[in-house]
């Protein structure tokens, strides 16, 4: 029974190595990556994931992103959100835009489990020492609709699952592909999922990105068009869908410049062939982990301003965000494996195929970009 239960909820805190974009020579931009080429290269960052594979219909999960290891409510981080197309249900959006700060872990999941993820964030926040008097929590939860592979109406993710993702969040490598909130997602007709990347700017700052890819258009990798899956034409691959992009940096930015940073993630998204369609939810959340700009009660009482980088220092960070987003999306697709499920109430098998790695290598080589 214990082995069965473990198979139902796979915790992905200690990932194995997977195929990544750089294995194909895909390395957008001039800047180097951090040691892990992941969002967790930003100091203090942690990621936790719970993947749910239940029976032949449940293919979903949750991914937790923690800006720092302390009490996030007591040490809020400045943040900004950019929306390219708003067909989505990003919880917490209005208060982040109004106040320019994030006070909770960020959770990503499927559309119909946003309430459970929010409840987990609220329970986690209220349970933290020092938060005994808290009466308002702005839970930030992003989502994409994984109903193409997952029985989304079953709302399989529990509050306990989401709390476990928060509790299991760790620094270090981040598993990519069909895991966590990316278990049931599809992008460009292929299996999508979780992907991450990072950049180090010449000034010594780090920008890290994590994506949950579940969107459409015509796939482009390193400037090379990639054909749709076998048996499908470009016209039959839906342009709809969504993507959640989380951008973290240790640069001490204001919430206004973090909103600008979030906007630059869309440049990376566009390079991958996104349609930005009517039915797409294209969201980017950006925040700074720099201790000097954290919003604490003591700092609010003692000062009216925080030491932060000026506008003229943002360009390298903007470039880093775009490049890391492009690579994170490529990683989400290249790391994903084939996922199958059954259409609820029928015997119909649903299947999302992975990118054909041999084909990708040939196409890149033909375009003059041979794999490393």
How would you name each of these model-derived features?
Residues 17-372:
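Alpha/propeptide regions of enzymes that mature by internal proteolysis
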């Amino acid at each position: 029974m214990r082995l069965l239960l473990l198979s139902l909820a796979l915790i992905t805190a200690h990932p194995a190595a997977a195929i990544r974009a750089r294995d194909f020579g895909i390395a957008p931009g001039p800047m180097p990556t951090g040691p892990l080429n992941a969002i967790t290269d930003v100091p203090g960052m942690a990621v936790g994931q719970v993947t749910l594979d239940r029976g032949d219909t449940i293919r979903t999960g949750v991914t937790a992103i923690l800006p720092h290891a302390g009490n996030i409510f007591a040490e809020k981080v400045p943040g900004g959100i950019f929306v390219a197309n708003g067909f989505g249900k990003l919880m917490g959006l209005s208060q982040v835009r109004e106040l320019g700060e994030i006070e909770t872990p960020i959770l990503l999941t499927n559309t119909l489990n946003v309430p459970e993820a929010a409840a987990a964030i609220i329970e986690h926040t209220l349970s933290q020492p020092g938060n005994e008097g808290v009466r308002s929590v702005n839970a930030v939860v992003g989502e994409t609709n994984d109903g193409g592979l997952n029985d989304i109406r079953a709302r399989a993710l529990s509050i306990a699952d989401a709390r476990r993702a928060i509790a299991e969040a760790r620094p270090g490598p981040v598993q990519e592909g069909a895991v966590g909130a990316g278990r049931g997602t599809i992008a460009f007709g292929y299996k999508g999922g979780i992907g991450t990347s990072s950049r180090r700017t010449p000034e010594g700052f780090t920008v890290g990105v994590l994506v949950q890819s579940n969107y459409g258009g015509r796939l482009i990798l390193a400037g090379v068009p990639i054909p749709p899956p076998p048996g499908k034409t470009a016209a039959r691959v839906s342009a709809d869908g969504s993507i959640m992009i989380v951008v973290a940096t240790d640069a001490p930015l204001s919430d206004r410049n973090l909103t600008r940073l979030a906007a630059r993630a869309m440049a990376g998204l566009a390079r991958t062939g996104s349609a930005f369609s009517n039915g797409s939810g294209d969201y980017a959340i950006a925040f700074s982990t720099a201790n000097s700009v954290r919003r604490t009660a003591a700092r609010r009482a003692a000062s009216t301003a925080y030491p932060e980088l000026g506008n003229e220092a943002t360009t390298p960070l903007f470039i880093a965000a775009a490049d890391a987003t492009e690579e994170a999306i490529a990683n989400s697709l290249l790391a994903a494996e084939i996922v199958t499920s059954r259409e609820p109430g029928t015997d119909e098998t649903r299947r999302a195929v992975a990118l054909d790695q041999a084909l990708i290598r040939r196409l890149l080589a033909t375009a003059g970009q041979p794999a490393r």
